[in-house]
Amino acid sequence: MYRVRSMESTATSSPSSSLMVHPTNFRVIIVGGSIAGLTLAHCLSKIGVDYVILEKRQQIAPQEGASIGILPHGGRILDQLGLFNAIQRNVEPLTTAHISYPNGFTHTNQSPTLIHERFGLPLAFLERRKLLQILYWSLPDTSRVQVGKTVVSVDHIWGDSGMAVRTRDGSTFYGDIVVGADGVHSRVRHEMWRLAEIDLPGSITEREKDGMTVDYICVFGISASVPDLRPGEQVASLHDGRSFLVFPGKDGRVFWFLLKKLDRRYTYTSAPRLTPLDIDTIAGSFISDHIWNGVSFGSLWERREVTGVTNLEENVFSTWHSGRIVCIGDSMHKMAPNTGQGANCAIEDAAALANAIHGAIEHVDRPSMAEVQSFLRSFNESRLPRVREIYKSASVVVRLHARENLALRLVGRYYLPYSGDVPANTASKLIADGVQLSFLAPSLHSGPGWEKYSMKNGVAKSTVVWTSLGILGLVVFLFLLFRVRARFSSF
């Protein structure tokens, strides 16, 4: 018999909010103790919604060598939740961006400082592990997070009155909706597809299921302090077929990524199976590559503290929900790390879903199946256009950084260094329309950029068009110029 457990007590409100919360009989099963999953848990706590998090690993925040960028739109949501101050204590805000090229040419701009001034929140970089720890330990009730719970199946309860989630250890969890926040290899996504095929055959096409591809692999890590790499100054080092992203952070620790193009495009299922044994082989090929200011990749490598390797899956799925199941974060959109948007999109997903849930239960204690499907559909439709735009930007930048073709090499070398505030403006347009939590007071950190660079007004849109036309014109000009030369010199 399906029975919903009520919340323990009224959740504490955000320091920046006077929201009065009232526990409801609506229960959410969150699969995955990820950034998306834990952020959603904080949001649900604020509106009195019962939840449980099922995490397959034995600990929430293992040391895996990964790092995370928090941009103003992600930071604004975390600030609404009363979490950003804890994050600020663990970061060195970015102020300067350096770009280096294979021929030794370098360029510096102040995009991070401009973005901070425009939006009132900095670009911050920290260990993924540290962010997970902050999200976990600041929960009102950590007992709602259950580790060692590997999900094996998700099913409807008879009569469509709820969902049952079963785990490998034999446990069963019941709730009104299931949220898949379990990453790129999502089990919930698989179960959503399975149930959708039963309920409405063909509703999720094979083309959609096979949409995720892999063009790049990434070796990433954290190194001890490297002389001549200054905290707060990020570096993008561009090479043919690969790039390095370097972020000197708090206490001199350096977060870095080596992104390497593969020999061809792979599908998700056919991509190389990487293991820790591959790390030394991949990294060892590029030890002598110049990064910045006399620093080579070898300087980072010899000071490495922890490393990892992964395929860089790329895709935005179209269908994020079916029935009472909805997926968020990397389970629905996976993008290259070059624009730092992955975690921020996941945080936005959690906030947008919480807004939808809050709207659905505001006047109804337990929404019906039709009402659940309605608000999940609206959530899906509202998120898709924005995430696609952010994804496209990341897709272009990872290829620009790896100088993937002639046009991108020309743009990267002969347009980007002389483009003024265009990089900051482009980033600002993607930041400005970020989601806010509708049920909490706005962040006290603000700036003129939220309004000025919003894509909801015609000025920002026309700026995008003219910038694109300018780049296109420059590419055509440079292409014609270089065509008359018998050989291309190094650039």
UniProtKB/Swiss-Prot annotation:
Q: Which residues are glycosylated?
A: 380
Q: Which GO cellular component term is one of those annotated?
A: membrane
Any one Gene Ontology MF annotation carried by this entry is: FAD binding
Please list the GO biological process terms of this entry.
biosynthetic process
Q: Which residues form the signal peptide?
A: none
Give, as in the UniProt entry, the pathway in which the protein acts.
Secondary metabolite biosynthesis; terpenoid biosynthesis
Q: Give cofactor(s), names only.
A: FAD
Instruction: Give the biotechnological use.
Output: Chevalone E derivatives produced by this cluster are interesting candidates for cancer therapy since they synergistically enhance the cytotoxicity of doxorubicin (DOX) in both MDA-MB-231 and MCF-7 breast cancer cell lines.
For this protein, what is the EC number?
1.-.-.-
Superkingdom of origin organism: Eukaryota
The alphabetized UniProt keywords are: FAD, Flavoprotein, Glycoprotein, Membrane, Monooxygenase, Oxidoreductase, Transmembrane, Transmembrane helix
Which residues span the membrane? 462-482
Where FAD binds, per the record, is at 55, 69, 128, 330, 343
Q: Where in the cell is it found?
A: Membrane
Membrane topology of this protein? Single-pass membrane protein
Keyword Protein biosynthesis (UniProt) = no
The record's comment on protein family reads: Belongs to the paxM FAD-dependent monooxygenase family.
- What is the purpose of this protein? FAD-dependent monooxygenase; part of the cluster A that mediates the biosynthesis of chevalone E and its oxidized derivatives that possess a unique five-membered lactone ring and can synergistically enhance the cytotoxicity of doxorubicin (DOX) in breast cancer cells. Within the pathway, cle3 takes part to the biosynthesis of the molecular scaffold by catalyzing the formation of an (S)-epoxide ring at the terminal olefin of the geranylgeranyl group.
Protein name (Swiss-Prot/TrEMBL): FAD-dependent monooxygenase cle3
Q: Which organism is it from?
A: Aspergillus versicolor
Q: Name the lineage.
A: Eukaryota, Fungi, Dikarya, Ascomycota, Pezizomycotina
- Name of the gene this protein is made from: cle3
